């Protein structure tokens, strides 16, 4: 028999009554009723109510023990009276009469209670993360994470993928974020980098003749924290396949994602075959390449309306003439909304840094007209054209934004979310997945005016190689794709460029000399020169998948030991100083900014 327990704290049922049992766990809660002391004993699996009578010689000792101390109890299972049954507990029909107990681990005074649902400052929670992880909600999140990863591994194996581990110490490469650098003791003055992603290695695996690869890969990026992004490190389901096109990758990932979300969530899937939305369409209709398709509001372009002579809204007309764009959002049947509804949205837009949102409501008495601060500037014919473009009807309202394309996309995207939430249009019980496809290969840096890769430099451009318009690189589309759920990007992926000559050409457009490419990507370029198959892949974020399944808004709620927003581990006191001897051994000296 196990020394510490005969059962876990979730196992005992009405069928266990009369049994002598041994339980071990943490004291979750104590309730002293004078002659009776109630102990809620908790372990990883659940909770059992234990009781001790004042006549028991151990009563006074047990009464003094601090919450969250670990104890072992010996006792007998008894049936609860009908009125004391707790239907919220798996063990709620029984309790254990304590005969004796043993303290296995004492607990100091708690900096935060474990049994409480009260929210505490992040600093306290992260410093005492081992206590925070005992709280039921986050404890369940971490268990969910483990189960999701285990299920993913099983599904990937069924799909014919093999799991391989790629190096953690590798070379630095410009993949978008700053690298974490590791000095080499044996090669003074040189550095390893922790991988931002196993990008080059997984392609090399394909070149090595393996057909389908995956791993639950740790990735390291020296970037700022966000609610949906941990600083420092994160994990992704990294996968790559040989002899595939874009749709082949989509079919595998869709099957996996649908199975995962059906197994671990009761929420509905809006689509089991995810819509494919071209990047340009996504930026127009949703103002973002991370659209939330639960939101029915659609953005339309009305720039040409402000060229018309029968539209006299001069502020917008002048801006459009100088190159600005006008985008609008239609809200259905909002004619009876109070003026405060519209003014509050306009005020909110100004708080976001925009100049506001113009608006009017379409009405019809004898003729079509527009009610609102700017309605008088539009003729009947102009309103009819707006209705034709946007699908607006009598009784609908229209919000307008005007400005530079990037600014107007940003504010209309935010406004789309804001208005939908105010009107309660979003079904929170739904997952809406989609693919955003046809990303541009290149973009122009507005500050330097130089051509840069817009996403992954290793992507294959679309079209026959002989027909690619290298003279107009901003027109080149790539086989790059993102998978998005409820406005959250889960992953980027691509069909890879496996042709060295083409890779040199594309890097030259982005300003790289051949020598620079050879220096940065020598292993990759060399391998591709020895017979590389067409291949592609993707890497959905494990943290974000679990965040969605757990219905959490912050990724730190599904990460076991996260850092804070300053990339500090408050529990382990990292990063920390190192001694002079360590630095000397590495050939390093510190030169700190004053």
Curated annotation (Swiss-Prot):
GO biological process: aspartyl-tRNA aminoacylation
Family annotation (SUPFAM superfamilies): Class II aaRS and biotin synthetases, GAD domain-like, Nucleic acid-binding proteins
Binding positions (L-aspartate): 175, 221, 455, 496
Superkingdom in the source lineage: Bacteria
GO terms for cellular component: cytoplasm
UniProt signal peptide: none
Keywords attached to this entry: Aminoacyl-tRNA synthetase, ATP-binding, Cytoplasm, Ligase, Nucleotide-binding, Protein biosynthesis
UniProt subcellular location: Cytoplasm
One GO molecular-function entry: aspartate-tRNA(Asn) ligase activity
EC number(s) on file: 6.1.1.23
PROSITE patterns in the cross-refs: AA_TRNA_LIGASE_II (PS50862)
Site keyed Important for tRNA non-discrimination: positions: 33
Region (Aspartate): 199-202
Residues that coordinate or bind ATP: 221-223, 489, 541-544
Gene3D superfamilies reported for this sequence: Bira Bifunctional Protein, Domain 2 (3.30.930.10), GAD-like domain (3.30.1360.30), Nucleic acid-binding proteins (2.40.50.140)
Major subcellular location class: cytoplasm
Biological function: Aspartyl-tRNA synthetase with relaxed tRNA specificity since it is able to aspartylate not only its cognate tRNA(Asp) but also tRNA(Asn). Reaction proceeds in two steps: L-aspartate is first activated by ATP to form Asp-AMP and then transferred to the acceptor end of tRNA(Asp/Asn).
NCBIfam families membership: aspS_bact, PRK00476.1
Family designation: Belongs to the class-II aminoacyl-tRNA synthetase family. Type 1 subfamily.
Protein name, UniProt field: Aspartate--tRNA(Asp/Asn) ligase
Organism field: Pelagibacter ubique (strain HTCC1062)
């Amino acid at each position: 028999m196990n020394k510490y327990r005969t059962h876990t704290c979730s196992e005992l049922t009405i069928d266990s009554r009369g049994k002598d049992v041994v339980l071990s766990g943490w004291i979750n809660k104590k309730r002293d009723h004078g002659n009776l002391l109630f102990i809620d004993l908790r372990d990883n699996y659940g909770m059992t109510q234990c009781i001790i009578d004042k006549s028991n010689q151990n009563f006074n000792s047990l009464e003094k023990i601090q919450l969250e101390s670990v104890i072992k109890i010996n006792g007998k299972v008894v049936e609860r009276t009908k009125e004391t049954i707790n239907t919220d507990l798996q063990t709620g029909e029984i309790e254990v009469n304590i005969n004796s107990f043993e303290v296995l681990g004492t607990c100091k005074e708690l900096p935060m209670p474990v049994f409480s649902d009260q929210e505490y400052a992040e600093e306290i929670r992260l410093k005492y993360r081992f206590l925070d992880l005992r709280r039921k909600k986050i404890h369940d999140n971490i268990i969910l994470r483990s189960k999701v990863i285990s299920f993913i591994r099983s599904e990937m194996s069924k799909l014919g993928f093999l799991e391989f581990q790629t190096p953690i110490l590798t070379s630095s490469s410009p993949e978008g974020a700053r690298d974490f650098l590791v000095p080499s003791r044996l090669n003074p003055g040189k550095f390893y980098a922790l991988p931002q992603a196993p990008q080059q290695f997984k392609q090399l695996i394909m070149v090595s003749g393996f057909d389908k690869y995956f791993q639950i890969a740790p990735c390291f990026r020296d970037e700022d924290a966000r609610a949906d992004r941990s600083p420092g490190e994160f994990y992704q389901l990294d996968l790559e396949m040989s002899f595939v096109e874009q749709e082949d990758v989509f079919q595998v990932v869709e099957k996996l994602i649908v199975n995962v979300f059906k197994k671990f969530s009761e929420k509905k899937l809006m689509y089991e075959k995810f819509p494919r939305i071209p990047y340009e369409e996504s930026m127009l209709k949703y103002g973002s390449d991370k659209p939330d398709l639960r939101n029915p509001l659609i953005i339309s372009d009305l720039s040409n309306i402000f060229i018309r002579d029968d539209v006299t809204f001069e502020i917008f007309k002048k801006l459009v003439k100088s190159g600005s764009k006008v985008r609008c959002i239609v809200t259905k049947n909002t004619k009876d909304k109070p003026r405060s509804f519209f003014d509050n949205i306009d005020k909110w837009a100004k708080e976001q840094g925009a100049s506001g949102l113009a608006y009017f409501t379409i009405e019809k008495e004898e003729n079509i007209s527009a009610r609102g601060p700017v309605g008088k500037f539009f003729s009947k014919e102009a309103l009819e054209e707006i209705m034709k473009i946007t699908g607006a009807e009598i009784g609908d309202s229209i919000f307008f934004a005007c400005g530079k394309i990037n600014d107007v996309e940003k504010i209309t995207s935010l406004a789309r979310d804001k208005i939908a939430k105010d009107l309660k249009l979003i079904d929170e019980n739904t997952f809406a997945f989609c693919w955003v496809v046809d990303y541009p290969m290149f973009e122009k840096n507005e500050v330097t005016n130089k051509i840069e890769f817009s996403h992954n430099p290793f992507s294959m451009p679309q079209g026959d190689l002989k027909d690619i318009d290298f003279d107009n690189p901003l027109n080149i589309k790539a086989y790059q794709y993102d998978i998005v759920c409820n406005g959250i990007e889960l992953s980027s992926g691509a069909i890879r460029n496996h042709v060295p000559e083409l890779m040199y050409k594309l890097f030259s457009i982005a300003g790289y000399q051949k020598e620079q490419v050879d220096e940065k990507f020598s292993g990759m370029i060399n391998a591709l020169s020895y017979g590389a198959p067409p291949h592609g892949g993707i890497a959905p974020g494990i943290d974000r998948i679990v965040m969605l399944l757990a219905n959490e808004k912050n990724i730190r709620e599904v990460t076991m030991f996260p850092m804070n927003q300053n990339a500090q581990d408050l529990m382990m006191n990292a990063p920390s100083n190192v001694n002079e001897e360590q630095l000397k051994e590495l050939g390093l000296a510190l030169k700190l900014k004053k």
